[in-house]
Regions:
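An N-terminal, well-structured beta->alpha segment
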Residues: 1-81, 86-92, 114-132, 140-193, ...
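Short, highly selective alpha-helical patches that border small-molecule cofactor pockets
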Residues: 71, 75, 79, 203-206, ...
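Phosphate-binding chemistry for phosphorylated carbohydrates and sugar-nucleotides
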Residues: 84, 101-102, 147-483
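Conserved phosphate-binding/catalytic loops in two-lobed NTP-binding clefts
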Residues: 90-104, 251
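Short alpha-helix plus adjacent loop in nuclease-associated cores
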Residues: 102-115
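Catalytic-core signal marking the mid-to-C-terminal active-site face
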Residues: 435-461, 479-588
């Protein structure tokens, strides 16, 4: 009932070189093969140099687990493996850092923060390193690392970033950018967000985060007294900053069973856990997955069916989903606006990375509004890489809600420099200008300054290592508040998704299919792509630009995945059936 996720030495997803080494270890059948695989793995490991002479090296291994009972036993076995690996390498010490029950993105963050703490330590000690005692220097280094890689440091980063992002703007509260935003801004906060935590560790993490908000306000050093046990079905947490209703905790059933973001996104309906089945209706809702790295928003509006009255009248439900595509749109458009207000639109490039599974309505909406996009192969590591390589600020979310916004180091430097320059200019202007002129100039400068501060707060609200559902909830809630408590319905209505259908076809050998153009086109077997193109033109006098279909092999089993998109569900069904038949004909 459990599995293993491995984080690379920088806090990112595991690279292909590591994947190959891990496969060699798992598939080793003899002791000689295992030794060879371990040698291959060791060659790729980054070690922490803990002395100037490089006489000592330490392999640091971070561990975390979710709320499943088997987790504790598996972690202990993994620790044994880490120590054994260190024992076969002379001069290498193994330091175990067990962070207990954490989300997957939290573990990514700890590894990321470890590296940043080491970089900062040696940068700050360049001049004093010659004079310092070596043992004292090493102790000081580990103190810095330990402080940076605790869960309190993680939660504090996100909480402080969010509080900075939503800091009240009294001028906007009174006037707003327009009448609608002005009226919305008078509300203290958004309506409560009901979060389906997939019976997983996200429930525990959200409770700890919420407890910290009050602690930060009180400038206290510990949040233990305000934490609650994460075992109940529902927990309601309301503060001045945010209102969350947490549902589906660790004791409510197996992780992801009939709940979680994957269930909601694929089935287009609310979680079906017995205790919470009806409680999502007419609410603002979100769903995370068991690892707490994916996020989708949804809403279910319920009312009486037209023409029926009385107690026995049936209810008609309208399910609305904001998946990864709409998360990308909201975040990207918000950041574009802030870059424009900050005067940085010409200095910092911004775009969206997506996969072939993104809805065609999404890509057309981006094109219509001048937002640059790039399509990558399926898989979060591929989309992450595309966002990183193509843009200074790359926003990416797979359709399932796994993603984030990546700020390059250069983009962060530009924003920070512009912020310092703007503060300096404001100070000079206020001393040089006359009183009546100063007021006019300060309004212009304040608009720019607020945008720069908003960008800085956004950076801090985001987990810099990987897509993180907790970070994403805070960012989305912050953006909706900054946009005058924007209603879910308005966000959802930015564009209308085209009907889609996804199916699987069993084949003898999935490797006969080769794809290109980010898996949107089929190269082999020869003739299959031509047949798909012909199917898309069936029953149509002219080419229908809303029709789209592609096939790709599964990465783990002998099946071919089929994706079809069309203007209506009936056409979608018809095309899907014909494409499936073509796959069977060409692949078997």
């Amino acid at each position: 009932d459990n599995g293993l996720k491995i984080v690379d030495g920088h806090g990112n997803v595991l690279g292909e070189a590591y994947e190959h080494a891990c496969e060699m270890i798992c598939n080793a059948k003899t002791e000689a093969q295992l030794e060879n695989a371990l040698d291959c793995f060791e060659e790729k490991l980054p070690f922490l140099e803990t002395s100037r002479e490089d006489a000592k090296k330490t392999a640091v291994v971070y561990f975390g687990r979710d709320t499943r009972e088997s987790g504790e036993r598996l972690v202990e076995k993994a620790k044994e493996g880490a120590r054994a690996l260190g024992g076969r390498s002379s001069g290498v010490a193994v330091k175990i850092c067990d962070r207990g029950v954490v989300t997957t993105p939290m573990l990514h963050y700890f590894v990321y923060a470890h590296g940043k703490a080491v970089e900062a330590f040696y940068e700050n000690n360049k001049q004093q390193e010659e004079k310092n005692d070596e043992d004292a220097t090493e102790r000081s280094l580990w103190e810095k690392i330990d402080a940076a890689t605790q869960e309190l440091a993680y939660f504090k980063r996100l909480a402080v970033g969010y509080l900075s992002l939503i800091e009240e703007d009294e001028e906007k509260k009174k006037k707003g950018k327009n009448v609608v935003e002005g009226l919305r801004a008078n509300a203290t906060t958004l309506p409560p967000l009901h979060i389906d935590c997939a019976n997983g560790v996200g429930f525990v993490a959200f409770e700890k985060l919420m407890a910290l908000f009050d602690v930060i306000r009180e400038n206290s050093s510990s949040s233990e007294n305000s934490r609650r046990s994460a075992t109940t079905t529902t927990t309601t947490t309301t503060t001045k900053e945010i209102a969350l209703v947490l549902k589906n905790g660790p004791n409510d059933g197996p992780v992801n069973l009939n709940c979680g973001s994957d269930f909601v996104q694929k089935n287009q309906r609310a979680p079906e856990t017995p205790s919470t089945r009806l409680s999502f209706v007419n609410q603002r809702c979100a769903s995370v997955d068991g690892d707490c790295d994916r996020l989708v928003y949804f809403s279910i509006e319920e009312g009486e069916e037209e023409g029926k009255e009385g107690e026995n009248s049936s209810k008609k439900q309208n399910f609305m989903l904001c998946d990864g595509d709409k998360l990308s749109i909201l975040i990207a458009f918000f950041l574009i606006e802030q870059l424009f207000l900050a005067g940085l639109a010409h200095k910092i490039s911004l775009g969206i990375a997506h996969t072939a599974y993104s809805n065609g309505a999404f890509t057309k909406f981006c094109e219509k509004n001048g937002v640059e996009t790039v399509c990558a192969k399926t898989g979060v590591k591929n989309v992450h890489k595309a966002a990183e390589e193509h843009f200074d600020i790359g926003v990416y979310f797979e359709s399932n809600g796994h993603g984030t916004a990546l700020f390059s180091d250069e983009a962060v430097k530009v924003i920070e420099k512009e912020l310092v320059d703007e503060l300096t200019r404001m100070s000079v202007e206020q001393h040089l200008r006359k009183e009546e002129e100063k007021h006019i100039q300060s309004v212009i400068l304040t608009t720019k300054l607020k945008a720069l501060l908003t960008l800085k707060a956004t950076i801090q609200t985001i987990n810099p290592a990987i897509g993180d559902a907790i970070s994403s909830v805070l960012l989305i809630e912050g953006i909706l508040r900054k946009k005058g408590n924007m209603p879910f319905q308005e966000w959802h209505a930015m564009y209308r998704d085209l009907p889609t259908k996804q199916t699987k076809v069993k084949v003898r050998d999935r490797t006969v299919i080769e794809c290109f153009d980010s898996e949107r086109k089929c190269l082999k077997p020869e003739g299959l792509q031509q047949r798909i193109d012909e199917i898309l033109l069936l029953d149509s006098c002219v080419k229908n630009n809303n029709r789209r279909a592609f096939v790709r092999p599964s990465g783990t089993e002998d099946i071919v995945r089929v994706y079809v998109e069309a203007s209506d569900a009936e056409t979608c069904e018809k095309i899907s059936t014909k494409v499936e038949e073509a796959v069977i004909e060409f692949c078997n």
